[in-house]
């Protein structure tokens, strides 16, 4: 994508850890992704907090002059928020409301390395795409092979007949932020939805790129 060409995405939700991991490569990847969002003029939606990978990417995007929205359950604020918080913070009641709000605000999703919470958020967005609840791109930044085993598990699911081959393609993965964003910019869904997009309460989940061109 040329420097003067605007991304198809206006806001992307990034799932990532409230820890930085043991190796610097993970912190570098969070900053690299932040740089890509700034370069493409994409606002950030994330899980709130100013520590770990969450803090690194939120500060980078904010310092780049773009909008940052952190969505965090009230119960997690004392744990995840420490030091200076940048951008806007929206406090919600629980984890379910958090994910719904993130999905409503963003036009696509990216998961950086993280723990159970990051993986759960990623898998829920994949599932929602499979079900037809949203038509938003789901990206996985596979830093230094962190998610190799998870991707292999998806392949096993296809081989054993639990995941349809088309649904395996819901996840767009790449080892670097630049490559991932390039693939996400070009991504077109190829899987069949379990139910129609219109049959869900999609107004609660916001717009997706291209929705404005859909015939009425």
Curated annotation (Swiss-Prot):
Keywords annotated in UniProt: Cytokinin biosynthesis, Cytoplasm, Hydrolase, Nucleus
The reaction(s) catalysed by this protein are: N(6)-(dimethylallyl)adenosine 5'-phosphate + H2O = N(6)-dimethylallyladenine + D-ribose 5-phosphate; 9-ribosyl-trans-zeatin 5'-phosphate + H2O = trans-zeatin + D-ribose 5-phosphate
Q: How does activity shift as pH rises or falls?
A: Optimum pH is 7.0.
* GO BP: cytokinin biosynthetic process
Report the EC code(s) recorded for this entry.
3.2.2.n1
Gene Ontology cellular-component terms listed: cytosol; nucleus; plasma membrane
Q: Where in the cell is it found?
A: Cytoplasm; Nucleus
Record Pfam families? Lysine_decarbox (PF03641)
What is the reported tissue distribution?
A: Expressed in roots and shoots. Detected in the root quiescent center and vasculature, in cotyledons, hypocotyls, stems, leaves, stomata, axillary buds, flowers and fruit abscission zones.
Spell out the Gene3D superfamilies in the cross-references. Answer: 3.40.50.450
Q: Write down the top EC class of this protein.
A: hydrolase
Residues bound to substrate are 80, 98-99, 115-121, 127
- Give one GO molecular function term: cytokinin riboside 5'-monophosphate phosphoribohydrolase activity
**Phenotype of gene-disrupted mutants:** No visible phenotype under normal growth conditions; due to the redundancy with other LOG proteins.
State what this protein does.
Cytokinin-activating enzyme working in the direct activation pathway. Phosphoribohydrolase that converts inactive cytokinin nucleotides to the biologically active free-base forms.
Q: Which family does it belong to?
A: Belongs to the LOG family.
Record-given protein name: Cytokinin riboside 5'-monophosphate phosphoribohydrolase LOG8
Q: Which organism is it from?
A: Arabidopsis thaliana (Mouse-ear cress)
